[in-house]
Amino acid sequence: NIVLTQSPASLAVSLGQRATISCRASESVDSYGNSFMHWYQQKPGQPPKLLIYLASNLESGVPARFSGSGSRTDFTLTIDPVEADDAATYYCQQNNEDPLTFGAGTKLELK
């Protein structure tokens, strides 16, 4: 199974500042010219919401404050600027190889 390691486990960011979350895969998640890495936001009591698909593509309706980058094994989710509504837990997920796997999550708190 591909293991996804997120860092940091938690972070506190002031409103208007930048938040950066990293996800490292134990092996490449690239195939056919795409990176099969996705990012989700989850708030308590709610299902996960897809933010970024295929490493860098913004899901419809998601603010452009969210962006994703990376390839092969190293990926980043950036939120810039952070707004109050962004307090949540963020997960990376790969589906290049079965079984699909998730990172352990990064909890974003507002200072």
Curated annotation (Swiss-Prot):
Domain of life of the organism encoding this protein: Eukaryota
Annotated stretches, region: Framework-1: 1-23
Region (Complementarity-determining-1): 24-38
Keywords: Adaptive immunity, Disulfide bond, Immunity, Immunoglobulin
Single biological process term from Gene Ontology: adaptive immune response
Annotated stretches, region: Framework-3: 61-92
Pfam families tied to this protein: V-set
PANTHER family for this protein: IMMUNOGLOBULIN LIGHT CHAIN
UniProt-recorded name of the protein: Ig kappa chain V-III region PC 4050
Species whose genome carries this gene: Mus musculus (Mouse)
